[in-house]
């Protein structure tokens, strides 16, 4: 019994050490995969597909961006790992209506709860308040999350190149298109761009924040701007 406890203690220490050496992005993805599996066990796909919004029409963010003077995608974010609470005591409706009245092309809604304080309810409230494209900003690792996005009123999903393989990006983006959703791919460097670019993507965005360290530099956008194709 003493040997068993010692072995269990050693394994626990190894797990703790591994967690301590992980960057924030790796921790988020581990938590996200667990979260998705839990949700799958609680809410079946059939329930998502039965949503009133599941078969509703979607708005094209890519078309609006091409014909816009501002080219702005605004964001609804409650907090983040780098800045803690940003604005936690506001009305989702007021924020998104303000964005729409300001002439933005679309709104990105954070739905991650643990690290960003968001929820799918925020997306639902936004959908009920505006008639411009909504992007579900989430760490998507599974088709189930794309079904959720459709059921809660998203028009666009975000795929993050840093956490997905090329095969996964292709699979997830094609699945999103099958549901009538557009796809915005987020890249951070040239390697991610060259690896992930493919016909099933509608838009590509450059994140100036390194998701592994959360450091920010505008040099990333400057470097990649000329390398992203127009079509």
Indicate residue ranges for each PLM-predicted region.
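Solvent-exposed, charged amphipathic helical/linker segments at domain boundaries
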Residues: 164-180
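Low-complexity, intrinsically disordered or signal/transmembrane-proximal segments
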Residues: 1-3, 9
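C-terminal helical cap(s) of enzyme catalytic domains, especially alpha/beta-barrels
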Residues: 223-227
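Short hydrophobic alpha-helical segments of the AMP-binding
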Residues: 149, 176, 228
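Short, intrinsically disordered, charge-balanced linker/junction segments flanking boundaries
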Residues: 20, 228-231
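Glycine-rich phosphate-binding active-site loops on the catalytic face of alpha/beta enzymes
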Residues: 148-168, 206-213
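Conserved N-terminal beta1-alpha1 strand-loop-helix module at the mouth
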Residues: 19-134, 141-144, 175-203, 212-221
């Amino acid at each position: 019994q003493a040997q068993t406890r010692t072995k269990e203690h050693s394994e626990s220490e190894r797990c703790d050490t591994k967690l301590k050496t992980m960057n924030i992005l790796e921790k988020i993805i581990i938590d996200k995969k667990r979260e998705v599996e839990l949700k799958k066990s609680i809410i079946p796909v059939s329930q998502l597909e039965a949503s009133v919004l599941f078969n509703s029409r979607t708005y094209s963010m890519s078309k609006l961006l091409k014909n816009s003077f501002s080219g702005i995608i605004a964001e609804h974010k409650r907090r983040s790992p780098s800045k803690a609470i940003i604005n936690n005591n506001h009305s989702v409706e007021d924020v998104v209506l303000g964005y729409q009245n300001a002439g933005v092309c679309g709104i990105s809604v954070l739905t991650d709860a643990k690290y960003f304080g968001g929820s799918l309810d925020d997306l639902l409230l936004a959908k009920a308040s505006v008639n411009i494209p909504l992007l579900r900003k989430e760490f998507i690792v599974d088709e189930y999350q794309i079904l959720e996005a459709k059921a809660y009123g998203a028009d666009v999903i975000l795929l993050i190149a840093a956490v997905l393989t090329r095969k996964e990006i292709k699979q997830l983006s094609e699945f999103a298109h099958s549901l009538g959703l557009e796809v915005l791919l987020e890249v951070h460097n040239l390697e991610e761009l060259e690896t992930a670019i493919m016909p099933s993507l509608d838009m590509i965005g450059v994140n100036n924040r390194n998701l592994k360290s959360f450091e920010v530099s505008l040099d990333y956008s400057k470097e990649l701007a000329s390398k992203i194709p127009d079509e």
